């Protein structure tokens, strides 16, 4: 769509001339920083999104469409804070004096993240179409470059990353550097979907193939199995929504709900039927360790199935659970019980239902959202802790990217609706 179209002008008018330009500046800043942080410092996604949220506060306008998912997340954060009253975790100082003290207050961090990340997601939905299209294009091309760089670096044993690291003056083993390179694949796996939609409208399949190949090669060499699984599952979701439309999207809602409801039961049934024991014999060491963690978590969920053990309780079980359960649904059940798992499940089902509504207008955009959503959930189900700041921030960034990727598409009559939450 032409940037001077009535739709684009309406979006700019709603935000105000100064506000619209400022949002465009913030969007460019975020997309330029994204590939740099993905490669050099993935933990930096947390401060990036927090800063973006603060920067857009003057332009923030809460809408009715954003209210339901935000209220669900507020309820989840409140329940998490309440659960601290019975959590076995020893709290830090009630009056934190430095960042180390804040690190121990997960409930406070969650509230701050919801405020800042949420502000970034909601405010950047008001980007004028021309600014969103520009930012989306920059991000897409930058991700292609990142995929090529990481693939080359992985094949060279992280030699490029080690060159950058010498600036810090600290030594790093090549195997550790390769692990650092692998972290970029998580951003690539999530942002592949909006980037591929943008590239498909501009250059056809060539750059998309390059982006996908670079991500797969890096994931394979660095043993980033979670990203390979995410791309496969996301690809299935993409195909289902792209070719079945609303029917496929409705099936997706059910598929997303199932793990939040049945995760502990599935593990316990697997133990009772001997499936878990069989998997222990078949899977490599890293997955064998996950099975042990999941079995332990499912067993302990039975002690407090409704209220859970309390926020951050996963950290208190010693070697049985190193830091977290490596499964988002089980961690929610273990720490926040059925209440927390239900709230999180409702939120993600709300997002998935947004894909159903989006499929009415554009199957390609709905398929993009489905692929990104499923990829995030798959990685969260086998790799990271639910409360890790950078991982939550990367999820928020994926929302923003999916919204921007819709600019210039065939269905932009509802330009304010940039994300599947609309």
Regions found by a protein language model. Give the residues of each.
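Alpha-helical transmembrane segments of multi-pass inner-membrane proteins
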Residues: 28, 115-119, 133-165, 176-243, ...
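Hydrophobic transmembrane alpha-helices and their immediate junctions
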Residues: 338-377
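N-terminal signal-anchor transmembrane segment
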Residues: 2-62, 76-92, 376-380
């Amino acid at each position: 769509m032409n940037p001077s179209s009535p739709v684009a002008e309406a979006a700019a008018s709603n935000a105000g001339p100064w506000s619209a330009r400022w949002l465009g500046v913030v969007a460019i800043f975020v997309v330029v920083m994204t590939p740099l942080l993905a490669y050099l410092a993935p933990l930096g996604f947390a401060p990036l999104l927090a800063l973006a949220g603060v920067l857009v506060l003057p332009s923030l306008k809460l809408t009715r469409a954003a209210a339901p998912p935000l209220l669900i997340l507020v309820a989840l954060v409140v329940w998490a804070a309440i659960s601290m009253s019975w959590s076995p975790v020893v709290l830090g100082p009630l009056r934190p004096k430095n960042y180390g003290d804040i690190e121990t207050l997960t409930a406070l961090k969650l509230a701050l993240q919801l405020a800042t990340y949420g502000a970034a997601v909601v405010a950047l939905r008001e980007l004028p179409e021309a600014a969103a299209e520009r930012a989306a294009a920059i991000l897409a091309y930058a991700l292609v470059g990142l995929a090529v760089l990481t693939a080359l670096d992985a094949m060279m044993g992280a030699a490029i990353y080690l060159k950058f690291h010498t600036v810090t003056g600290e030594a790093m083993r090549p195997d550790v550097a390769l692990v650092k390179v692998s972290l970029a694949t998580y951003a690539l796996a999530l942002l592949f979907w909006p980037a591929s939609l943008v590239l498909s409208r501009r250059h056809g399949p060539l750059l998309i193939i390059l982006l996908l190949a670079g991500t797969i090669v890096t994931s394979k060499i660095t043993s980033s199995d979670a990203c390979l699984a995410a791309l496969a599952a996301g690809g299935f979701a993409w195909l289902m929504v792209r070719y079945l439309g609303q029917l496929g999207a409705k099936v997706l809602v059910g598929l997303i709900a199932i793990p939040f409801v049945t995760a502990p039961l599935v593990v316990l049934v697997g133990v009772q039927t001997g499936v878990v024991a069989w998997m222990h014999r078949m899977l490599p060491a890293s997955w064998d360790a996950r099975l042990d963690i999941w079995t332990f978590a499912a067993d302990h969920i039975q002690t407090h199935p409704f209220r859970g053990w309390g926020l951050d309780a996963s950290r208190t079980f010693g070697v049985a659970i190193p830091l977290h359960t490596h499964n988002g649904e089980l961690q929610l059940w273990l720490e926040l019980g059925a209440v927390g798992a239900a709230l999180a499940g409702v939120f993600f089902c709300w997002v998935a239902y947004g894909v159903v509504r989006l499929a009415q207008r554009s199957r390609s955009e709905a398929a993009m959202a489905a692929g990104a959503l499923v990829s995030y959930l798959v990685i969260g189900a086998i790799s990271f802790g639910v409360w890790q700041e950078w991982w939550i921030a990367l999820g928020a960034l994926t929302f923003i990217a999916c919204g921007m990727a819709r600019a210039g598409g065939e269905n932009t009559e509802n330009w304010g609706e940039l994300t599947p939450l609309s």
